[in-house]
Amino acid sequence: MDFQQLADVAEKWCSSTPFELIAAEETERRMDFYADPGVSFYVLCPDNGCGDSFHVWSESEDCLPFLQLAQDYISSCGKKTLQEVLEKVFKSFRPLLGLPDADDDAFEEYSADVEEEEPEADHPQMGVSQQ
C-alpha cells in the first residue's frame, strides 16, 4: 500500500476517534497524531518492498508507557494493517483520554447479568445426609 493510501486510512480512522492526523511525512513514512489533553504519538509505516512492520512511538513521557500494549501487539506474529495498529493504540490510550476501557465495559455487562441471577435454594450440600 502506498503512503497516500495509508494516510487515507489514517484520516478515516481519525474521523471515529478523538485523534487528528497532524502531519504525514511521505519521505520518512511517518504520521503524527494528536488528541486533547496532550496525547500524541506517531507511526512509522513500513516501505512497500520491505518486510518491516509498523512502529509506534511517542515523544511524550506521559504517553509512552501507554503504548506498550500496541508495541507488543505489533511485534507479535503476523502482519498487521495500519487500521489494526491504530485501533490497538486507541485502546491503549483510552485511560489517558478519559474514556472507559473497552474491556471493562464488557466485564461490567457480564457481571451485571451474573448478579441478577437468583441463588437456587434447597440444594443438598455434599457430604451432608438428608435424613
From Swiss-Prot:
<dbReference type="GO" id="GO:0046330">
    <property type="term" value="P:positive regulation of JNK cascade"/>
</dbReference>
<keyword id="KW-0597">Phosphoprotein</keyword>
<dbReference type="GO" id="GO:0023051">
    <property type="term" value="P:regulation of signaling"/>
</dbReference>
<keyword id="KW-0963">Cytoplasm</keyword>
<dbReference type="Pfam" id="PF15167">
    <property type="entry name" value="DUF4581"/>
</dbReference>
<comment type="similarity">
    <text>Belongs to the MTURN family.</text>
</comment>
<dbReference type="GO" id="GO:0005737">
    <property type="term" value="C:cytoplasm"/>
</dbReference>
<keyword id="KW-0217">Developmental protein</keyword>
<feature type="region of interest" description="Disordered">
    <location>
        <begin position="107"/>
        <end position="131"/>
    </location>
</feature>
<protein>
    <recommendedName>
        <fullName>Maturin</fullName>
    </recommendedName>
</protein>
<feature type="modified residue" description="Phosphotyrosine">
    <location>
        <position position="34"/>
    </location>
</feature>
<feature type="compositionally biased region" description="Acidic residues">
    <location>
        <begin position="107"/>
        <end position="120"/>
    </location>
</feature>
<dbReference type="GO" id="GO:0045654">
    <property type="term" value="P:positive regulation of megakaryocyte differentiation"/>
</dbReference>
<comment type="function">
    <text>Promotes megakaryocyte differentiation by enhancing ERK and JNK signaling as well as up-regulating RUNX1 and FLI1 expression. Represses NF-kappa-B transcriptional activity by inhibiting phosphorylation of RELA at 'Ser- 536'. May be involved in early neuronal development.</text>
</comment>
<dbReference type="GO" id="GO:0070374">
    <property type="term" value="P:positive regulation of ERK1 and ERK2 cascade"/>
</dbReference>
<dbReference type="InterPro" id="IPR027892">
    <property type="entry name" value="Maturin"/>
</dbReference>
